[in-house]
């Protein structure tokens, strides 16, 4: 396979950095959809077959979109830099049905879990301290239902009793960088390079069931919940592999450090990883047996499970530069050009697997031409890259 490839096509709508991408494979739709958010508060719902927007929405005052999560029942949770988590309908009306204040002073996303009909749980950074976690429960029918279950949770004291490798100097875990969920367990990646997995039980206790130091002392940049494990990335050139089965049993014993319980069998830390041909990995996805990795330097690579490089994608910046000095300075301009990264920054990454779409309802389409286009699209897996210049590139895998 040629290691350098151009995109099959590019979606153009956003005028600013595409800060998050989210594929929606909804049972009522004839084909997968894509949601994109940008640095000026715009959200767009895309028809991937016709390659054009279905509808779009701009949040008042144009705050940067931090993260997107599809909840259920046609609701999209949107975190923005106005310190708000909004729940919007994606039926074209973009009606806001709920709003929660959330700390967005750091890089962290958020996590929403469904508890019951209309009831949800929110895990996010503490409103004042980005090194700790708040947990809320609420019902979408009432703004007054918002209840903070835990305030300012910190895990450092609970895990400080664990045996750390020689050379570790850990006096705190740092700010929360990333949240995700895997088989009901909540995972958070920390600035110190630790990944911590915990459960919430009925009596309000927090159970720590997993701890990894695989990226210490480098910060966690991304977490991806795959089919078999969770993958993590950092500023180093390795991908952390987090398998909860090696640290979890039917009913483990816990040591109490109220309100946090630490699993007694958790006497050692996980450090399973694979080295990859790229560093500063800001975004990570896995599609079937393919690993998608994007760096801070604007490169995206595709590898197989043996970390064999299969493809590399990048987008060049505009080479036109404006020099306001009327006399100019050829030497300084040449030095500046050489020192700058020629690639456009990757600001978001998403993947679409052909296997995830095999049960799609595209056969209900009565338009023969549309049905053929859907079939051709779903035959392939796709690497979808959002760039700092607002473009969204689609690469066939």
UniProtKB/Swiss-Prot annotation:
Region (Disordered): 324-356
Keyword Amino-acid biosynthesis (UniProt): no
Subcellular location: Nucleus
One GO term (biological process): chromatin organization
Keyword Nucleus among record annotations: yes
Biased segments, Low complexity type: 332-356
A GO CC annotation given for this chain: nucleus
Major localization listed first in the record, in broad terms: nucleus
Residue spans of the WD repeats: 16-56, 212-252
Keyword set, alphabetical order: Chromatin regulator, Nucleus, Repeat, WD repeat
The protein's role, per its UniProt record: Component of the ASTRA complex involved in chromatin remodeling.
Similarity comment: Belongs to the WD repeat ASA1 family.
Assembly and oligomerization: Component of the ASTRA chromatin remodeling machinery complex.
Protein name: ASTRA-associated protein 1
